[in-house]
Each structure stands twice: as structure tokens, then as C-alpha cells.
Amino acid sequence: MYGFNCIFLMKSRNPLISVGVLCFLSARRKAQFKKAWRDAPLYPGDPLVFAANVTLDEATAHPALLVSERGRRVTWQETCQDLPSSTQRFNSIPCVLGQLRINSGRACWEVEVGDMQSWDLGICRDNVTREGVFTMSPQNGFWAIRLYDGDYWALTSPETSLPLRERPLKVGIFLDYEAGDVSFYNMTDGSHIFTFPQNTFYGVLRPLFRLWSSDSGSLTICSAEGECTDVVIHMPTLQEK
């Protein structure tokens, strides 16, 4: 089983180095990169896997959330839409799920949060409750982090305070299904935000997004083709020891 780590690369004159993300590195490589991730080699022989192409599932969106035509942006609106009742739709907490359904393998995506003051981002099981008020926690099928009124939290039970050295303008979510690993990274400075304790996943997982009525802004999913940033994942070739 591989450990989970990401290395964010800055601009370089070396044509082999691009702005992006190196993920899923073995323990040996993590040790190499721990103190000087900016100078880490790329191992260009590794196979490449590109970021997941995530769009929003409008059928799951709370009536106060407006999903863009392309399905990449969700915006809070004060007046709820008049929508038919559906068991797929969140009817109390303003959430929306991604179309992507994951039951194996690895996936990552990036979300532009900008200067918003409040949001939740992460993953959840496809069968989580969507009616009424509920607590987001791994015990209830949610693995997410939260920004609320300037403070960052991991939605563990109880919640874990996250002291960040720099405010993220973009957040990277990285999932390794078989390893039971969910990690979050600040795509602004390349720093690690939080990794949930190892889980044993079962069933289908989906990207999760939440807005708050206290902050009427938008969340934008970056495209797999690099609409927000150039994201490239290198898979490991060395086994972790």
C-alpha cells in the first residue's frame, strides 16, 4: 500500500518540470522530498494519471444553490429555486455533489475558493442522508474540511482546528480508495492542509461541496485540462517499505 503525499512544483527552466502536482509517492521518495520539495526530481519515467474531470450534479443541489451551465461553478442565491422534491436533493444543508462516482483507484481535483469566507469541501458516500440537518463526519460518511468565518476545520469527530500558514485560493482534494486515504492541499503555496486517519472505504464515493448563507460567493471546479492550473500526477514505481 502506498503512502499519500503531494509535491507542488514551481516554474523551472527545466523542460521536464511543469507547474503541477506529484502525488502518491512511496515512503522513500517522501523522505527525499520532506525538507526540500521545491528541488525534488520528477522521475519522468513514471506513468502519468491526469486529474479527474469533475462536474456538479445539479439534481443533488440544494434549491439555494445555482449550478452553472457547464457544471463547474456553484453559486449561493438568497431566493431558493422552485424545484420538484427529490430524494437525491439536499433539502436543508446547502450542498451539491459531483457527478464523479469513485469505487476504486485514485482521483484528484482542484477547487478555486478565492476570497470566500465560508465553505466545505471533500468527499462523501453516495448514500449519505440528504434530508434534514445532519453532522458531517467520517462516522456519517463525510470526509471534508471547512472554512467558516476565517477559521479552518477538519470535520472529524470532534472537529480538528487547522492552523494554516497561508490562506488557500485553491484547494486540492486527493483520494486513494484502496489505501483509504483522503488528503487536502493548499494549491497556493503547496502546503499540506490535512489527511484523515486511514479508512476502509466501501461503496461509491463522490465529491462534496457546500456553501453557507453567510457568504454569498461561488466555488469553481478546475477542469482536468488545466482551466485553473496545470495538474499532473505521477504514479509510484517504488514499493513502500
Predicted feature residues:
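Beta-rich ligand-recognition domains in immune and ubiquitin systems
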Residues: M1-K241
